[in-house]
Amino acid sequence: MSEISDAEKVRIASDFIKHAPPGEFNEVFNSVRMLLENDDLLKNKCVNAIAQYNVGQFVPVKLDGVAKQTLITPYNDLGNGRFYDEVSKKSFKYDHVRKEAADLQPHPAESGITEQWRQALQTQLDIYIDDHYAKSGTGVVFARNGVFTICIESHQFQPKNFCNGRWRSEWNVPVGDGKSGSQEMKGKILSQVHYYEDGNVQLFSEKEPVLKVNVSADFDKTAKEIIHAISEEETIYQNAVQENYANMSDTTFKALRRQLPVTRAKMDWNKAQTYRIGQEMK
């Protein structure tokens, strides 16, 4: 890349970083480092791309002395590299390259009814995560300026099996504004999987559902209804992805199979649907 300007090098390197598959950031980062051959340029000019990647992927992080992980998201970003954990009420400095938290400091909770709503939602979300996500799930309810957002992340990284994947979802929860009755709840669900044994199959799926939920002054009852609605919608989405993938096995993958013997790929396309790409994350 010696004939390319530094600005163009940064643009190309940043694009590679921001599109790294789940669980493969280190491999992409090291490859970019070799291409740039300039650690100062990588450290000083590509750090924004690394931060965007971590925030966009809802990367989980463990805080010292805190039982459960929290997430790196736009909804708990305090700026200047600091984030906060809603459960422990601590803010921390996050190293986007090392993916480590440091300098924990007390962080004030939202006051009064806002924190009551947040705790009720977090209690029900914890139950849902424990019941439906395979060990690696993390769910956090963020409350900021009276606005509630539920973020969920789950991943399965299996490099020995040449397969990595991540599930993310976020939900804007319509509580805390004094309104009751049927309210609109908007969400976004994303799943991304990379299978790469003697071939390269990437699954990226996104859906932005809009649900109706009943909101009342009863914190616990409303929280249960909201998490139940999320559970139903995420199950519908998961089943639809699996069904579409099974259909692709009989259409798209069969068309590809005629060309694959030239590459001597080992993947059995007839059994593609049995690989359960995306399913093991939830």
Swiss-Prot record:
InterPro entries, per the entry: CapZ_alpha, CapZ_alpha/beta, CapZ_alpha/beta_2, CapZ_alpha_1, F-actin_cap_asu_CS
Biological-process GO terms, alphabetical: actin cytoskeleton organization; barbed-end actin filament capping
GO molecular function: actin filament binding
Keywords assigned by UniProt, alphabetized: Actin capping, Actin-binding, Cytoplasm, Cytoskeleton
Protein name per UniProt: F-actin-capping protein subunit alpha
Known partners and oligomeric status: Component of the F-actin capping complex, composed of a heterodimer of an alpha and a beta subunit.
Function: F-actin-capping proteins bind in a Ca(2+)-independent manner to the fast growing ends of actin filaments (barbed end) thereby blocking the exchange of subunits at these ends. Unlike other capping proteins (such as gelsolin and severin), these proteins do not sever actin filaments.
